[in-house]
Regions:
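Short, flexible micro-motifs
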Residues: 14, 143, 162-164, 178-179
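Flexible, glycine/small-residue-enriched loop-and-beta-strand segment within the central core
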Residues: 67-77, 82-151, 172, 177-178, ...
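C-terminal/domain-terminus segments
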Residues: 151-164
Length: 187
């Protein structure tokens, strides 16, 4: 029989009040609190805390405080990753970033969602859908990336305040609510 954690990571309905998951969330809260309290010049401490928190991080990862996430271990970032102030990642399912990604202040990325039917939703169970963000992506300030979205590679730019509800092809600028293609980019 699968654990609630296995169900969660696989995107199946699961019980978020499971003891193991509650301990994991508390551990992530502790690490993010310690990270958010670091001083600006203590890059080594910040880097070590991020390596302990995140599920995978290549070289040159920089995140500005305040940063918040559910578990951390479902967040995987490529080389040259930068997230500015006040980014939030609800990572009940994997959130994966390619190389050379930049997040402006206040970006929210959600892999968590809830059943639509009220009886099922009121049971307290939830589920998620993974989010994948390709290489060379810049996400503008206050943008929201919803569960299940895949963003392509090569100079994808998500405009400030965009609400991304559907997959995004490569080589485009998107913006709006819901986000739509504004411009095709030639790479």
């Amino acid at each position: 029989m699968r654990t609630e954690k296995e169900k969660m990571i696989n995107g199946d309905l699961y019980e978020p009040v499971d003891e193991e998951l509650m301990k994991d969330r508390l551990h992530a809260r502790k690490l993010t609190r310690l990270f958010n309290q670091t001083i600006e010049t203590d890059i080594e401490k910040r880097t070590n805390l991020l390596k302990e928190l995140l599920g995978g991080a290549k070289d040159n990862v920089y995140i500005e405080p305040n940063f918040k996430c559910d578990y951390g271990y479902n967040i995987h970032v490529g080389e040259n990753f930068f997230a500015n102030f006040d980014c939030i990642m609800l990572d009940i399912c994997p959130i994966r970033f390619g190389d050379n990604c930049m997040l402006a202040p206040g970006v929210h990325i959600y892999s968590a969602t809830h059943p639509l039917h009220p009886d099922e939703r009121n049971s307290g169970k939830e589920y998620g859908e993974p989010v994948t963000i390709g290489d060379n992506v810049w996400i503008g300030g206050g943008a929201i990336i919803n569960p299940g979205v895949t963003i392509g590679d090569n100079v994808v730019v998500v405009g400030a305040g965009a609400v991304v509800t559907k997959n995004v092809q490569s080589n485009v600028v998107i913006g709006g609510n819901p986000a739509r293609v504004i411009k095709q980019l030639v790479v």
